[in-house]
Amino acid sequence: MARRELTQQEQEQFDKVLTETMTKPLDYVRHDANARCDEALRRATAEHGMGFLGSWWVLVELLCSKSEHEYDVRDATGWNILALDMSTCGRLWTADECRDFCEQLAGYGLIERELYDMGRIVNDRICREVEKYARAVAGKSLGGWKPNALSGNAKRNA
């Protein structure tokens, strides 16, 4: 069954809802039940212990809870903010610890190396999940219209 094309007005509404939804913090973090079996996470956990895995999930929650789903760490203030946000359960992080942790994450491919080198902490999988969710919300705003496959998130790579 072929999908009908959107009218210009419908496309504008879809794009508006899509953009609004993609830039909002998420209330819920969807992840696979076997996420711990991810090769990069297994390698990192084997080398650094379960604390590393727990810290990774704290960062995932933080990324999901931020509008735009990324951290700007181009300067000392950005690193200090991340350190404060990573501090949980009585464990205080320093900016240097955050830098070391994120460098390791980039090395494992858990955050995007190229964007990290530009001072942005971004996880591509989170971006894809946010876009998938946003497309579903935007489609529902048009009475259940279903969008085609994901187009990628060019905005993140701009």
Region annotations inferred by a language model:
Residues 43-44, 58, 69, 134-138:
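Surface-exposed beta-strand edges and their flanking turn/coil or helix-capping segments
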Residues 47-78:
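Short helix->loop/beta-hairpin flanking segments within DNA-binding domains
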Residues 1-40, 73-81, 87-158:
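Winged-helix/helix-turn-helix nucleic-acid-interaction surface
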